[in-house]
Curated annotation (Swiss-Prot):
PROSITE patterns given in the database record: GATASE_TYPE_1 (PS51273)
The protein, known as: CTP synthase
Lineage start: Bacteria, Bacillati, Bacillota, Bacilli, Bacillales
Annotated catalytic residues: 381, 507, 509
UniProt region (Amidoligase domain), positions on chain: 1-267
Length: 535
């Protein structure tokens, strides 16, 4: 029978529930179990697709095209699994489904209420996640903080699940904070006690408490937490600050978290073999080289907006024993006069995805500098589009060339709406989303990277290269090295007479793994290292 683990958070947000859940998932997978994982977000948006990155950080896209919380990126990278649309559920999605059922008459004229209709729909999403993936264990992270009004239906639903499937098949893990008061020189357990009290008032008794702390906690303090929260002292797990996120699974294993879980859920499985993971952590902590990548974007004040890009760069760096230093550059501040100073000492330049006109001219200026100065360049999504616009303007001489998204009246719409997007009015969930095939041109840098004729990558875009300009650009030396199998859509562009200048319409950052870097990121970092004469 499928087992269910629920991870909740208390005291404050951003305690690392997602990393805790991901790390546990990795440990259980390495015990030979089939694990899936999901995130419940209490906000009323249907998904984060239309939310500002400043509000929510990166939007992570799954193979089946779901626009999801950035925690799913952590889940995929840690556990090395591909998730689906059932892995991220929001209040908005739940209510939308229930209201559609009510309009269809599915409730036979009954009064639709939070209990049982909303809670039943939430429970259905938990059970469906396990059924769709044939999982031995489903890990569900509940977003927000215990005590928030928005989280109550989710907490009630996971309380009911224990009755539905039996206490031996459900486990509750609560993440809390033990703050250190510098003035008093003391750590305080009272916030944790009150958070657990709040959780218990809702009918949920945690089986494990993961204590987030910046200072080591004593056994006496663990015993105190265990006494007041009514759990075994061995079930108080310390989660201190880590040098690298990837060491956290090993820290949790050392404290026996996975053994506690297997014992409680009566899972008969082998010990987790973490030797490969230990080698990864050893490598990460002992990198001997450094490469600097200038990341030119519009949301650089919030690095979480590009978290998968940065992690993918790091994964690529690990393959070459290199520590990646990201130089954050606000695209709005880039001009012809200062671009050289801004990207000074950068071994490579990366322009990531984005929407809207803010910072676009700065990105175009950056691309021009990378092209002319022969600096390794990697463009992603909008990064590919601005690379195409820059070439049209400055090599073909098409003055005023632009994207129809930014300048609808441009005489040369190098980037235009996808044909199927012409009559769409809604912004949410209407992009070209998810995994699509890309056919590569033999002999190209893209082909060298993938060593494959057809590859599959995840997309999130509405605009595409305009084929009216394809022949003209090709004749001027622009290489279309990746297209959809029918040749209709441009997926990858590159330049011949350049050390490494490649840009993709898709988002390769969503498929990178710490032990298996994504091919284009790997070759971009390799080219950056070679250029800096560090390899």
């Amino acid at each position: 029978m499928t087992k269910y683990i629920f991870v909740t958070g208390g005291v404050v947000s951003s305690l690392g529930k997602g990393i805790t859940a991901s790390s546990l998932g990795r440990l259980l997978k390495n015990r030979g179990l089939n694990v899936t994982i999901q995130k419940f977000d209490p906000y009323i948006n249907v998904d984060p697709g239309t939310m500002s990155p400043y509000q929510h950080g990166e939007v992570f896209v799954t193979d089946d095209g779901a626009e999801t919380d950035l925690d799913l990126g952590h889940y995929e990278r840690f556990i090395d699994i591909n998730l689906n649309k059932y892995s991220n559920v929001t209040t908005g999605k739940i209510y939308s489904t229930v209201l559609k059922k009510e309009r269809r008459g599915d409730y036979l004229g009954g009064t639709v209420q939070v209990i049982p209709h909303i809670t039943n729909e939430i429970k259905d999403r938990v059970f469906r996640a396990g059924k769709e993936t044939h999982a031995d264990v489903v890990i569900t992270e509940i977003g927000g903080t215990v005590g928030d009004i928005e989280s109550l239906p989710f907490l009630e639903a996971i309380r009911q699940i224990k009755s539905d499937v039996g206490r031996d098949n459900v486990m509750y893990i609560h993440c809390t904070l033990v703050p250190y008061l510098k003035a008093a020189g003391e750590m305080k357990t009272k916030p944790t006690q009150h958070s657990v009290k709040e959780l218990r008032s809702l009918g949920i008794q945690p089986n494990v408490i993961v204590v987030r702390t910046e200072m080591p906690i004593s056994q006496d303090m663990k015993d105190k937490i265990a006494l007041f929260c009514d759990i075994d002292p061995k079930a108080v797990i310390e989660a201190g600050d880590a040098d690298t996120l990837y060491s956290i699974p090993l820290d949790l294993q050392k404290q026996g978290l996975d053994s506690l879980v297997c014992s409680h859920l009566k899972l008969d499985c082998r010990e987790a073999d973490m030797e490969e993971w230990k080698e990864l952590v050893k490598k990460v902590k002992n990198l001997s080289k450094t490469v600097t990548i200038a990341l030119v974007g519009k949301y650089v004040e919030l690095p979480d907006a590009y978290i998968s890009v940065v992690e993918s760069l790091r994964h690529a760096g690990y393959a070459f024993d290199a520590d990646i230093q990201v130089k954050w550059i606000n695209a709005e501040e880039v001009t012809e006069d200062n671009v050289a100073d801004l990207v000074q000492n950068a071994d490579g330049i990366l322009v990531p995805g984005g929407f809207g006109d803010r910072g676009v001219e700065g990105k175009i200026t950056t691309v021009k500098y990378a092209r002319e100065q022969k600096i390794p360049f990697f463009g992603i999504c909008l990064g590919m589009q601005v690379a195409s616009i820059e070439y049209a303007r400055n090599v073909l001489g098409l003055e005023g060339a632009h994207s129809a998204e930014i300048d609808p009246s441009t005489p040369y719409p190098i980037i235009d709406l996808l044909p199927e997007q012409k009559d769409i009015e809604d912004l949410g969930g209407t992009l070209r989303l998810g995994l699509y095939p890309c056919k590569l041109q033999e002999g190209s840098k893209a082909y060298q990277a993938y060593e494959n004729e057809v590859v599959y990558e995840r997309h999130r875009h509405r605009y595409e290269f305009n084929n009216e300009f394809r022949q003209q650009m090709e004749e001027a030396g622009f290489v279309f090295s990746g297209t959809s199998p029918d040749g209709r859509l441009v997926e990858i562009i590159e330049l011949k007479d350049h050390p490494w200048f490649v840009a993709s319409q898709f988002h390769p950052e969503f498929t990178s793994r710490p032990t298996r870097p994504q091919a284009l990121f790997r070759d971009f970092v390799h080219a950056s290292l070679k250029t800096s004469e560090k390899l």
